[in-house]
Every structure is written in structure tokens, then in C-alpha cells.
């Protein structure tokens, strides 16, 4: 144990994973951090391995993926691990954010950790989109064309930026090379942001707890107590991931992507990966192209205003019944947006999308501060009574 406390690198590991004290009352909702770290590790290892066999060219990208699947030893396993862990990564991130919403993890002194977390989410979406383009199937090509074309909504310079990103007048070899290079490098930037996120949590007030109260006294070391608690969910997660990888590896993908990219034939519906669907629904719900793009980016950036719009006296929603109802309605609305993002742009889905988009933004800007003020008023009245 002495080397753990004297070695310059190992003592950091010791401070964060062994000796760091945690509140005694945190539950399994606090296990998402370790699972997300595991997902990031799997993605980097499998991604680097896949990069050794991938060829980023219009002529060979699709064939190189087939080569990985058929000819590389356990290539099918590496590829399916990479694609399914990406979905698991986003699923766990959404749960992690939901826990942060419910227990007020965005409030001081953890505001910096929350803002870094939002930046991580935005970067993850960019990395996920870049990766979706690389197999160069039908959905890869047309997804890349549609999403990059959104930048053309920027007045005057938009089209020039799009052509600069493409390296030509359409998606071509230069585009694939750029996307591959960025998709390879950005996960390491993501890992650096994750370390910053961890430092922001640990150097401010440490982990929060379900009561939302400062837990400076009733604490226990991370190892062995929470280390074994994390291992339980890690084993359960690996079991669940294995079911997807071995028995239904393509259930979360799109069958169109098993057709080689054809610039002369547009798919019946251009749908991104499931984890981008809520924001795609917000984009499509606004008829104006520029306003739709602004709304889509605003729907992510608006997460950063939560520390200012939650005006409640108490931290978290566990003792605030009206805020709980508003939160569950928000979650339902988010799941509805996820469904609407996969639908065709036709009535009644357009109208439902517009209502859901309005409710999404209203939760942050109107419902949350309004309900907080109402609850504060009721608390004041009960104290005076």
C-alpha cells in the first residue's frame, strides 16, 4: 500500500478509487459513473482495433467493414461490441443526466461538473455521428449529407463551410478521411474531459447523496465498499451487453446501412441513430431551416441554464411533489420526442413534434422556475402558519 501513496501517478489512483470518502447513503443510481468509464474504455480499445483494419475511402470503406466481419479473427465481435456499447454509452448517459436532474446535481457547488458533463454530451453526439458515417452504407452517406447540410443554414458563409467540411461538392474520399481522423482523435479529447469532470466533482464537494444534504461526516472510503457495489452493476451491465452483442447485434441499427452507399438512390426515410432522435425531432418540428438548427443546438446548451432556473429552496426533487410531477412529465415528453424523431414528416407527427418541442423548452424556462417559486411560497406560508 505504501507505493500507492508515494508514486506520483498511483497516488492519484489511490485518491480517487481507494481512499476517497463517499456518503454512506448513496444508492445504485450513483453507479453510472463507473459504468460510463467502462463504456469509454471499451469504445477506445475496440475503436483502435477496428481502425487497424478500416480503409477510409469511398471505394473501400464498406468492403473494409465486411473484411473485418468475415476475415479478421473475432472481427465481428469487435465491431458489434463497438456499435452496441455506443448505444449503451448513450443510454447510461441519459440515465446519469436524469439522476442529476432528479437529485439536483447541477446546483452549487457542483455547477462546474454539470457544465463539463453537458460539454461531454455534445462531444459524444458529434463523435457518434462521425462514427455512423464510417461504414459508408446508405444511411451513412445520406445521414452525413443531411446533417452536414444543416450548416448551410448559416447566412452567407454556410454553403462554403459545408463544402470545406466535405472537401468537395458532395460527400467523397476527403470527407471520409476527415471524419475518420476526427472519430479516432476526439475520444481521447473526451477522455480528457471525463478526467476534468471527475476532478470537478471530487475537488468541490465530492459525490452528492439522495437526501441532498451536505454529507461531510457520515462517510466511508470508496474501497472496498463502493468498489464491490460498482462491480455488481458492472457484471450486470456486461451480461446485458453480451445479450445484445451475441443474440441481437443489429436490433438498434438500421437495415439500410447494410446496403452499400449509392449517391443516386435516396432511402425512403433518413433516420439517425436512436440516441440522436429527440434532438432530430426538435430540428424537424420547426419549418424554418436556420431556426430548426438553432433550436436543435439550443436544446443541448439549455441544460447549462438549469442551475439558474431551479429556484427551489431545497436541493433535488425528492421532497418537492409538484417538481416531481413536472419532472416525470418532462421525461415522458422526452421519450415522445424520441419516438417522433423516427416518424415520417407528416401530420399528425409534425403537430405533436411542435407541441413536444415547446414543452421541452418550457420546462427549463417556465415550468421549473414557476413550480419552484410556487413551492417556495407554500413552504413560507406553512412556516408562518
UniProtKB/Swiss-Prot annotation:
The chain crosses the membrane at residues 32-52, 76-98, 113-133, 179-199, 226-246, 290-310, 322-342, 349-369. SUPFAM superfamilies: a domain/subunit of cytochrome bc1 complex (Ubiquinol-cytochrome c reductase), Transmembrane di-heme cytochromes. One of its GO terms (biological process) is mitochondrial electron transport, ubiquinol to cytochrome c. Binds 2 heme b groups non-covalently. It is a multi-pass membrane protein. It is found in: Mitochondrion inner membrane. Component of the ubiquinol-cytochrome c reductase complex (complex III or cytochrome b-c1 complex) that is part of the mitochondrial respiratory chain. The b-c1 complex mediates electron transfer from ubiquinol to cytochrome c. Contributes to the generation of a proton gradient across the mitochondrial membrane that is then used for ATP synthesis. This is Cytochrome b. The lineage of its organism: Eukaryota, Fungi, Dikarya, Ascomycota, Pezizomycotina.
